[in-house]
Curated annotation (Swiss-Prot):
The keyword Nucleotide-binding applies. Residues 1-10 have a biased composition (Acidic residues). PANTHER family: CINGULIN-LIKE PROTEIN 1-RELATED, MYOSIN-6-LIKE. Gene3D superfamilies: 1.10.287.1490, 1.20.5.340, 1.20.5.370. This is Myosin heavy chain. Signal peptide: none annotated. Pfam families: Myosin_tail_1. Residues 11-20, 506-524 have a biased composition (Polar residues). GO terms for cellular component: bicellular tight junction; myofibril; myosin complex; myosin filament. The keyword ATP-binding applies. It comes from the Eukaryota. Residues 56-70, 342-359, 398-418 have a biased composition (Basic and acidic residues). Residues 1-27, 48-71, 307-422, 506-529, 644-692 are annotated as: Disordered.
Length: 692
């Protein structure tokens, strides 16, 4: 049995070493998880930097919008200047009409004068009429050009006014969208603050529950230790009771063997009976205390389970609240995604219109190749507008490059967020593995504790059996000595048996705690009395009996040393089991702390993902606004090119009119050369020329 007990102890020590190695592995896994969490915090800081960069880029974009607004104001001022120029053109047109009316009056005067002066001044009149016709034709051409130019300028003015109105409407829409986005941002910030407060409350409740659980666990350990002490005291008292009952039986046997010293034996029996009653009372008190401690232990366990259930219930409720908030936020994100899709469809339609406008521009460029010159004033204005368009195009290109940079930064931040999510998943998996390992370690710890308890019980049983076997062997030796000795040595043999029993009682009293010290002192006094009696009996007996008693005492000392070594081994095994239990509990607390640290990191990662999505949406809206501005600027450029083409067409019409006027003047000169031979025909021709 002792060898089996030693084997069990070795197996328990091996299991304890395995548990220690597993706890070391779990500690390594926790260290890896801490390292991963450190990397996650670094990545979160980098994401925060990227978010700050994106915010700065958004501020730059708002500055660009402000600059575009200023440019719009400048374009409006230029439109006002063009309107003033149009008014001047209308005034010049009025002057030309006045000159034309004056020329008609002069022609009428010349006609009247020609009618009065007669044929003598036909040639002069013809020359004056030709000059006047040329002048009238030039005036008409200039007037037509001015009218066409005024009409084109009026159309340009109307178009520019319409564009300005469209731009103002778009600006108002953009401002309304910006205000809506700011309101949404404020609402989201309020929700985030509310979530933070709720998370802080949940964390405070969880910390409080864990502190209470730790306090209850410490009280539970104290109650367990107290119960173990009471159990040990109870076992010690049982051993003492057994020893006293054995002593009482031996005394009764002595009384049955002989009637000598009956008075002393009767006193001793009464004394032992009183001591037995006292020990029985102490045993009952110990049992009552043990029952009280067990009741306290059950009460503490019930309170601990109730507290654990309440904390789990609160955590589940908080998790449900967070899940509901997360679903609401997901719905908002889906609605925003739908709006983004509609805006992307409108953007595709704008791309189609842009392609159509590009085709129209190609056709207009083919028409521009056939034109020759542009009027000076319109050319200057066109150059100014082209310079402005180039500046706007360069600004748009800069904004597009900034947009590409922002898109790249957003993509980088998204990749970082994905990497963070992967790392968080890995950390979560590692924590789950650590949790499973912790549970396995706890199961092994409970199995080891049960095994140690069983081994302790086996050890106690084996020790008791060994002590009883040694006791029986000693009794057999004493009986052999009784058979060899004479009747005069009976008292000495009984005293030796009493010494052996009292020595076994002393060994059991050494294993008990300080509460059993009083009973051991009483037993030691009894041993002293019996030793004095034994010395008296030895004085009466022979020297051979003394040698045998010495041998028996040496054997008793050896047995005591063996029992002490076995007790030390058992105590060491119990200490090792308690140390492993403490290590497992510390590991469980560290895993719970890591779980607490991981939850705020997950929350911050989710918040950063939400902020990234918002920034991405804002970037897409800014891109759409830029595309609308760019399309409007291109439309203005197309309209300006149309105006330029109309100016060129007017100039070509002017040249054609001049050519027709030159042809008409040539025919008039040929009619004048035929005038002397036929005096009346020239008049009719000149009249027709005037009508023409």
């Amino acid at each position: 049995k002792v060898s089996q007990l030693e084997d069990d102890l070795t197996t328990s020590e091996a299991k304890n070493t395995k548990a220690a190695s597993r706890s070391g592995g779990l500690a390594k896994q926790l260290a890896d998880a801490e390292h991963k969490l450190g990397l996650a915090t670094k990545n979160i800081k980098s994401l925060e930097g990227a978010l700050s960069d994106a915010k700065s880029a958004a501020e730059d974009e708002s500055k660009g919008k402000h600059d575009n607004h200023q440019k719009l104001q400048n374009a409006l001022s230029e439109i006002e200047a063009l309107t003033e120029q149009l008014d001047e053109e209308q005034a010049s047109r009025q002057d030309l009409q006045n000159k034309f009316s004056r020329a008609n009056a002069d022609a009428q005067q010349w006609k009247n004068k020609y009618d009065t002066d007669g044929a003598s001044r036909v040639e002069e009149l013809e020359d004056a009429k030709r000059k006047l016709a040329n002048r009238v034709q030039e005036m008409e051409e200039a007037l037509a050009a001015a009218e066409s130019k005024a009409a084109s300028m009026e159309k340009v003015k109307n178009r520019m006014n319409e564009e300005v109105e469209d731009l103002l409407l778009d600006l108002e829409k953009a401002q309304a969208q910006a205000s809506n986005l700011e309101k949404k941002q404020k609402k989201v910030d309020q929700q985030i603050n509310e979530w933070k407060l709720k998370c802080d409350e949940i964390q405070a409740d969880l910390d409080k529950a864990q502190r209470d659980a730790r306090g209850y666990s410490t009280e539970l350990l104290k109650v367990r230790t107290a119960s173990e002490d009471t159990i040990e005291k109870y076992d010690a008292l049982k051993k003492e009771n057994r020893a006293l009952s054995a002593e009482l039986q031996s005394v009764t046997e002595q009384l049955s063997d002989g009637g000598k010293n009956s008075a002393e034996v009767e006193k001793l029996r009464r004394k032992l009976g009183m001591e037995n009653e006292e020990l029985q009372i102490a045993l009952e008190e110990a049992e009552a205390a043990l029952e009280q401690e067990e009741g306290k232990l059950l009460k503490v366990q019930l309170e601990y389970t109730q507290l654990r259930q309440s904390s789990d219930r609160k955590l589940s409720e908080k998790d449900e609240e967070l899940e509901g908030l997360r679903k609401n936020h997901q719905r908002q994100m889906e609605s925003l995604q739908n709006t983004i899709d509609s805006e992307s469809r409108s953007k595709a339609e704008q791309q189609k219109l842009r392609k159509k406008y590009d085709a129209d521009m190609m056709e207009l460029e083919s028409q521009l190749e056939s034109s020759n010159r542009v009027a000076a004033e319109s050319q200057k204005q066109m150059k100014k507008l082209q310079a402005q368009i180039k500046e706007l195009q360069s600004m748009i290109d800069d904004e597009s490059r900034g947009r590409d940079d922002m898109r790249d930064s957003a993509s980088r931040s998204e990749r970082r967020a994905n990497d963070l999510a992967v790392q968080l998943d890995e950390a979560r998996v590692a924590l789950e593995q650590a949790e499973r390992a912790r549970k396995l370690a706890e199961n092994e710890k409970s199995e080891n504790s049960d095994r140690v308890a069983e081994l302790q019980a086996l050890y106690n049983n084996v020790a008791n059996a060994k002590a009883e076997g040694d006791y029986h062997s000693l009794q057999e030796e004493i009986e052999d000595l009784e058979n060899e000795a004479k009747a005069s040595e009976d008292k000495a043999q009984r005293a030796m048996a009493e010494v052996a029993r009292l020595m076994s009682e002393l060994n059991s009293a050494q294993e008990a705690t300080s509460t059993a010290e009083k009973s051991r002192q009483l037993v030691s006094k009894q041993v002293a009395d019996l030793q004095s009696r034994l010395e008296d009996a030895e004085a009466q007996g022979g020297k051979g009996l003394k040698n045998q008693l010495r041998k028996l005492e040496q054997r008793i000392m050896e047995l005591e040393s063996d029992v002490d070594t076995e007790a030390r081994k058992g105590a060491d095994a119990i200490k090792a089991a308690r140390k492993s239990e403490k290590k497992v509990k510390e590991l469980a607390f560290t895993i719970e702390d890591e779980h607490k640290r991981r939850e705020p990191a997950q929350d911050t990662a989710d918040k950063l993902n939400q902020k990234l999505k918002k920034m991405r949406m804002q970037l897409e809206e800014a891109e759409q606004q830029k595309s609308t501005w760019q399309s409007k600027y291109k439309k203005a450029a197309v309209e300006l090119e149309d105006a330029e083409e109309r100016c060129e067409a007017a100039e070509a019409a002017l040249q054609k009119a001049r050519q027709r006027a030159r042809g008409a003047s040539g025919s008039a000169t040929r009619g004048a050369s035929r005038a002397p031979s036929q005096p009346r025909t020239p008049r009719s021709k000149t009249a027709r020329a005037g009508e023409d």
